[in-house]
Curated annotation (Swiss-Prot):
It comes from the Bacteria. This is Small ribosomal subunit protein uS11. Pfam families: Ribosomal_S11. GO terms for cellular component: ribonucleoprotein complex; ribosome. It comes from Laribacter hongkongensis (strain HLHK9). One of its GO terms (molecular function) is structural constituent of ribosome. One of its GO terms (biological process) is translation. The keyword Ribonucleoprotein applies. The lineage of its organism: Bacteria, Pseudomonadati, Pseudomonadota, Betaproteobacteria, Neisseriales. HAMAP family: Ribosomal_uS11.
Length: 130
């Protein structure tokens, strides 16, 4: 009788990272939070839409807070303690996402605004008339 082939599966080892970078992309429609290590490899990410908010509720500070908590909890499993926060965009989730990360117990070492500013590049969208 032939011997059955057995496949050994190695247990996935989670890497231990003590310092990370939280990239907060706050647009007018959504907020995306990505937590990476120092080299830029993503450890965790979350969005307002992925946290269960749809439509105009995605662009609220509360939705950004929930998304930051979701990304932060996964990053804590990797052992992240210190965070450097880089905020990009003009959206309403800028401040609340940083507050949520601080409330989770992360030590925030620096907060920097990396919003791209054009040197008279593309024409901006026309002003809204309501």
């Amino acid at each position: 009788m032939a011997k059955a082939n057995t496949v050994r599966v190695r247990k996935k080892v989670k890497k231990s990272v003590s310092e990370g970078i939280a990239h907060v992309h706050a647009s007018f429609n959504n907020t995306i939070i990505t937590i990476t290590d120092r080299q830029g490899n993503a450890l965790s990410w979350a969005t307002s839409g992925g946290a269960g908010f749809k439509g105009s509720r995605k662009s609220t500070p509360f939705a950004a807070q929930i998304a930051a908590e979701a990304a932060g909890k996964v990053a804590q499993e990797y052992g992240v303690k210190n965070l450097e926060v880089r905020i990009k965009g003009p959206g309403p989730g800028r401040d609340s996402s940083v507050r949520a990360l601080n409330a989770l117990g992360f030590k925030i070492t620096s907060i920097s605004d990396v919003t791209p500013i054009p040197h008279n590049g593309c024409r901006p969208p026309k002003k809204r008339r309501i």
